[in-house]
Amino acid sequence: MRGLLTVPAPAQAAAGAGAFDPDRGWRLHAQVAVRPEPFGALLYHFGTRKLSFLKNRTILAVVRSLADHPDVRSACRAAGVDDSEHAPYLHALSVLAGSHMLVPQEADQ
């Protein structure tokens, strides 16, 4: 399977308390804009000036619904991603969290 996300600049993995945990709730950072495209979407973070590409509409559906679910796996299931297919989605979401596109649901806005 091809990757689900393209990040132009190297994204560093989140560390410490901010490390990506798919068993907790996540949401888009308040400074991130989503622009749907035929291939998926563009994400732009106005604070860091980073641009990320979501390579299909399924990952876009997951990202958009994160705030509506108690954890990442629930958001994946709601978007129609089978449990056996979660790995590439979790990886893409981890990269987005590492680049501060996603933040924990309980994080300050």
UniProtKB/Swiss-Prot annotation:
Q: Which InterPro entries match?
A: MftB (IPR023850)
Q: Which domain of life is it from?
A: Bacteria
Protein role: Peptide chaperone involved in the biosynthesis of the enzyme cofactor mycofactocin (MFT). Binds MftA and MftC with high affinity, and is essential for MftC activity on MftA, likely via the formation of a ternary complex.
Describe, as the record does, how this protein assembles with itself and its partners: Interacts with MftA and MftC.
Q: What family, per the record?
A: Belongs to the peptide chaperone MftB family.
Its protein name is Peptide chaperone MftB
Q: Which organism is it from?
A: Mycobacterium ulcerans (strain Agy99)
